Each structure stands twice: as C-alpha cells, then as structure tokens.
Amino acid sequence: MPLPGETHITEVRTMVNEATITRLYEMRLSTMATSYRQQMCDNGINKLSFDERFGLLVDIEWTARKNNRLKRIIRSADFPISGACVEDIEYRTDRKLNREQIANLATCAYIAEKHNIIILGATGAGKTYLSCAFGISACRHFYSVKYIRLPDLLDELSVARGEGIFRKVIQGYKKIDLLILDEWLLSPLSESESRDLLEIVEARHSRCSTLFSSQFDPAGWQVKIVEGPLAESVLDRIIHDSYIILIEGEESMRKQKGIK
C-alpha cells in the first residue's frame, strides 16, 4: 500500500500529465497526446531517458503528419486508380516496357528538372494505370498532382472563360507540379479548344511537368489542333522535352484481367 505522501505525489503527477495532454490537443498534436497517454500506462517506458521518450513522441507525431499529408495529396489528385503503383507494373515480354526507365522516372527526378512524360499505347494497353502509378510516385515525394481527362479539362477551361475566371484557372494549373492529361488528343479540337489547350500547355512549359497519355503517335498531334504555327512550336517543345514510353502488347490489359 502506498504511503499518504506517495499517493499525493501520484495524484499531482496525474493532474500535470492530463493538463499536458489537454494542451497537446489544443495545439493539434493529437497523435503525440495519444502516444504520451500510452507512455503513462507503460511501466517499461521508465527505462528510457527523457530524451529517448520525447524523441519517440516527436517521431510518432511527425510520421502521422507525413502520412496524413500524403493521403490529402493523393485524394486531391483525383486518380481513377488510386491503388496504382510502379511496384505492381506488369513487365510481360510483349509489352516491351523498359524496367530501368520506369524505375528512373519513379524517382521523380524529371519533375525536379521540369521534364515531361509521354505514354503511348492502344486502348486497354494500361496507359491510365501507368499514368496513375507515376502520379502516386510523385505524391509519395510530396509533389502536387492532378489527373484529368483532356475532354474534361477543355470543358473546365470553356466554362472558366464564360465565367470570367479563365486567368485564375490557368494560374491554378501553373502551380501543379505534375499534371496528368489522359485521353490526349483523341479527336480534333475546335479553334477555341485549340487556343485554350495551347494556353495552358504554354503556361506550364519549363515551369512544371506534364504527363501526356495518348493512343496516337506525336507525329499526328499537330493536325488535331487548329492553331497551325503556334501548335507546331508548342508541340515540338513538348515532344523534345519528354521521356516517351510506348506500351505494346498482343492483348489489352482489360482482356488479360478478364475485364469487359
């Protein structure tokens, strides 16, 4: 049985600890607060020095914040395949993917260098999965990422022009570290669509990275954009500043996996 003095000391210590936990919550250090409470219930923790115990609390809070930040970045990217990752890419012989090239791109050095990626392949080749895998790799490096289909982007830009916020939208896209444009130039664009598309591509050039996912060879891109000389200039810069990945394959990935 503890002596009366020892009981008083324990009660005071508990009050101090609870006050500390309350302040941690008020400072939005909830993970640290929870871990501190767990330490209070762990008799073995007393074997550690104060610095060691404090270091554990800081590490746990830091890790939780990093994980939460990563989740927010991935969620805001709007990936259609949120579980895609480069580790799960299938390197079947018929796909002729360069494992070393993909591993190098997964380091995201190309983003730091403001380069682009072009992914080419037929319908069902796995372009969207590979695009999302590169996007999630970028998220893991805490780059901002946005996935969007080109038709949806053109609709967004058209609406922005009508509402008088076109410049604001363009400025927003200039801040995204990696913009993934899926279904790139599947069909010819109108004059206004061509103008809007070239505007956003030009605004991002040499400032940030873009991933273009397309069924068609870059040699045929220009004929789908109305703005002739300007289109040629912009597209030429895109192509010469990009890493190109061609996904081949005798069967589509959907057929391989039994997806209709």
Predicted regions and their residues:
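Conserved phosphate/pyrophosphate-binding and hydrolysis machinery centered on Walker-type P-loop NTPases
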Residues: 26, 43-48, 79, 91-95, ...
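Intrinsically disordered, low-complexity and often Lys/Arg-enriched segments
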Residues: 1-22, 255-260
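Extended interfacial segments that mediate partner engagement and assembly in macromolecular machines
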Residues: 67-120
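Conserved P-loop
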Residues: 97-175
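Residue-level preference for the first positions of well-ordered beta-strands
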Residues: 116-118, 178, 209-211
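Interdomain "pre-motor" coupling segment immediately N-terminal to P-loop NTPase/helicase cores
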Residues: 30-82
